[in-house]
Amino acid sequence: MHISSLPGKYGIGTFGRSAYEFCDFLEKAGQKYWQILPLGQTSYGDSPYQSFSAFAGNPYFIDLDILNEKNLLDKDDYEEKNFGDNKEMINYGLIFNEKMKVLRKAYMNFNSKDDESFAKFIEDEKKWLDDYSLFMALKYKFNFISWNSWNKDIKLRKNEEIEKYKDELKEDVNYWKFLQYEFFSQWKNLKDYANKKNIKIIGDIPIYIAQDSSDVWSNPDIFLLNKETLEPLKVSGCPPDAFSETGQLWGNPIYDWGYLEKTNFEWWVDRIKSSLKLYDILRIDHFRGFEAYWSVDYGEKTAQNGKWIKGPEMKLFNVIKEKIGDIEIIAEDLGYLTEETLEFKKRTGFPGMKIIQFAFGGDSSNPYLPHNYEKNCVAYTGTHDNDTVRGWFEVTGSKEEKEKAVEYFKLTEEEGYNWGVIRGVWSSVANTSIGVMQDFLNLGNEARINKPSTLASNWSWRAKDNVFTNELANKIYRLTRIYGRCE
């Protein structure tokens, strides 16, 4: 469950009391992992997979009550603000309009000159923080237009122009640094609390970066861009398949892996190091893109005319191991996989993913059926891109697939189809099993987080107050203990 989906008073889940209470709930339920979506600052469309920075955190998650405890805000500054009337859905427009004003007030009450920890944070994170903070100050100054539409000198980062805006926007730049300081401070305290309860945080890293991001603006050489306009030459996507005749056109700029290799993959090493400050375990999205990626000419309307290009494969991960050491990674290996992709994943040793909803098409050799699992995998009841179990049974699953699922897991209405599927995942040989919180709560597709290739209402679901009960925790604990997953 993502941070944004936590219950609470101020429109969106935060690093506040509800997050700590959720850690308590997970401990009572005998759970060892809390998997979340990317924590990056969201942009248009509110997707955590399209953020303004691969390094910065989302200011929306900063808890206002904690700022009050630090004497940076009075309760009157935020308690009566309109963050949205529906506690089960995030209104991102209101959060953007109201919460950012409140956070600005907190900054105005913050004495950065006398705060040694703030100065240390700025120095420690200087490599990305300076560019990001200037980027965000410029985004606000230029009414959020894409940096590709800024005037040429600042778009191309001419030194005189950079220095001019650093001076002109000095206070705004410092404000964005303050927000990152608060984000990382509050998150560290929450993560430490979870870790003391023997709960590891599984974080999510998108393989690609948004074109309209501080990373592309400040590091154009690591992407395949037109040297004059800095627009992409190639963009990301995936090829046509049984689900889409034209494929999926994601539109992110493609890495210049040749250039990155010459730098010993410095940017990627920095990114992994930074991510390990946030998470204990990293799930890397679209992992197959490191073996080979689908490259589409910029300007194409669909992905169907793209082609496969070889990726860095083990060269990248050998450098990461050399520079950082052994780290825990989950390879998101869903979708179109070739023998080369499977062999590459095997060489990394990283566990892949098994999604139970994919199990009931085809015959008994379907790799997503639990009897075909290998131990070195992570089994899921679903992900942010799937229906809930209840939604699958009620709406989207085919009659044949649902009949197979009922027979395979011996599902009954008395037990509850959701609990029967969870039981099936928990009882598998997978080293790790993870359930979507909506499935434990037996919610339908109204609680689905994301429907790919659509825009409306994605990333908006929030849990109701008081749903993480002792009764539910005990039920999850009993199931977890039966299958030896508490040890």
From Swiss-Prot:
Location, primary (coarse class): cytoplasm
Catalytic reaction annotation: Transfers a segment of a (1->4)-alpha-D-glucan to a new position in an acceptor, which may be glucose or a (1->4)-alpha-D-glucan
Any GO molecular function: glycosyltransferase activity
Keyword line: Carbohydrate metabolism, Cytoplasm, Glycosyltransferase, Transferase
One cellular-component annotation, GO: cytoplasm
Pfam families: Glyco_hydro_77
Source organism, top-level taxon: Bacteria
Location of this chain's protein in the cell: Cytoplasm
Alphabetical GO biological process terms: carbohydrate metabolic process
Signal peptide span: none
Enzyme class: transferase
Enzyme Commission number(s): 2.4.1.25
Summary of the function given for this chain in its UniProt record: Catalyzes a disproportionation reaction in which single or multiple glucose units from oligosaccharides are transferred to the 4-hydroxyl group of acceptor sugars. Glucose, maltose and maltotriose can act as acceptor, whereas of the three only maltotriose can act as donor.
The family this protein is said to belong to: Belongs to the disproportionating enzyme family.
Protein name: 4-alpha-glucanotransferase
Originating organism: Clostridium butyricum
